[in-house]
């Protein structure tokens, strides 16, 4: 019965508007409204990704190239053919030089010099400036190349994802050149190889990028302190003997200045106003960059050009900056009771037999034969140092 009476009924439920359910106006303070608006803007900014994420292929390619060049160096070195004693002789021509000669498990200094290692005498007297670039692609041993390439992967992948291969590639090469340049101005003896200067350039660029793009980062103080701590630890290692800290300092300084040039980004407010909803009236239009970013960009570019130009002029004139700076050597090595920074004097006897020169180290009695060439007389001291290790 009840069902029959209600069959023709149609019931509609209408929800009243929210304003009708509550006729009491709620007032919020200006500070609360501003805070809510900023939270909404930050939430929308987090969803809105204004910066393109790049696929990182350059850094892995650099790693592969460095490892390949190290393998080529070992192939050319051919220790069993050129030396009486070799480490891991079962590797054939890829065997390592003796530990006393190269504790990093790698080729001889002569092989690295043929491959393009940084030799100041070659740069100054033969004007082989290209060695300032080629040396950053070579490594002294297995331990050396592994340490540098792992660090490059750890640092470089993220930077390439954020800024692209063009800017990071230029940053890597120019920083490496800066490290080689400063190293050649102070380290006049021996040869130098390695990508450490370029790696420190990436660290320096990370620091300047954080400073110049300060407004777009959260937890910026924690990130800044962490980065400074990492940089300080790495630079502190450079005060140990046999570590080229001038290359580290030159690369870091170059990268720090290059970061202000290559890694500048628009400020937070610029992208925030672009993401405002339609109809929202912004208080004032934000410029793409802040004034201090322009100042840092111009200042850094001028310092880079002036520094590189002056450094090349001083280097090609053959000037030894150690004679003009009595304390600068402490930047690369600080003597303690555990080690000495002074190079031990070595003495050798030489004699010529036909087209070969016989060199004997007086300290350890080791003897080596060298084929005579035009540059052998000028490199006797270097060959003697290698023989007496």
UniProtKB/Swiss-Prot annotation:
<protein>
    <recommendedName>
        <fullName>RHOMBOID-like protein 1</fullName>
        <ecNumber>3.4.21.105</ecNumber>
    </recommendedName>
</protein>
<feature type="transmembrane region" description="Helical">
    <location>
        <begin position="244"/>
        <end position="264"/>
    </location>
</feature>
<dbReference type="GO" id="GO:0000139">
    <property type="term" value="C:Golgi membrane"/>
</dbReference>
<keyword id="KW-0812">Transmembrane</keyword>
<feature type="transmembrane region" description="Helical">
    <location>
        <begin position="295"/>
        <end position="315"/>
    </location>
</feature>
<feature type="active site" description="Charge relay system">
    <location>
        <position position="248"/>
    </location>
</feature>
<comment type="function">
    <text>Probable rhomboid-type serine protease that catalyzes intramembrane proteolysis. Unable to cleave the Drosophila protein Spitz.</text>
</comment>
<dbReference type="GO" id="GO:0004252">
    <property type="term" value="F:serine-type endopeptidase activity"/>
</dbReference>
<keyword id="KW-0333">Golgi apparatus</keyword>
<keyword id="KW-0720">Serine protease</keyword>
<dbReference type="InterPro" id="IPR002610">
    <property type="entry name" value="Peptidase_S54_rhomboid-like"/>
</dbReference>
<dbReference type="InterPro" id="IPR022764">
    <property type="entry name" value="Peptidase_S54_rhomboid_dom"/>
</dbReference>
<feature type="transmembrane region" description="Helical">
    <location>
        <begin position="163"/>
        <end position="183"/>
    </location>
</feature>
<feature type="transmembrane region" description="Helical">
    <location>
        <begin position="136"/>
        <end position="156"/>
    </location>
</feature>
<feature type="transmembrane region" description="Helical">
    <location>
        <begin position="56"/>
        <end position="76"/>
    </location>
</feature>
<dbReference type="InterPro" id="IPR035952">
    <property type="entry name" value="Rhomboid-like_sf"/>
</dbReference>
<feature type="transmembrane region" description="Helical">
    <location>
        <begin position="221"/>
        <end position="241"/>
    </location>
</feature>
<dbReference type="Pfam" id="PF01694">
    <property type="entry name" value="Rhomboid"/>
</dbReference>
<comment type="similarity">
    <text>Belongs to the peptidase S54 family.</text>
</comment>
<feature type="transmembrane region" description="Helical">
    <location>
        <begin position="191"/>
        <end position="211"/>
    </location>
</feature>
<keyword id="KW-0645">Protease</keyword>
<keyword id="KW-1133">Transmembrane helix</keyword>
<keyword id="KW-0472">Membrane</keyword>
<feature type="active site" description="Nucleophile">
    <location>
        <position position="196"/>
    </location>
</feature>
<keyword id="KW-0378">Hydrolase</keyword>
<dbReference type="GO" id="GO:0006508">
    <property type="term" value="P:proteolysis"/>
</dbReference>
<dbReference type="GO" id="GO:0005794">
    <property type="term" value="C:Golgi apparatus"/>
</dbReference>
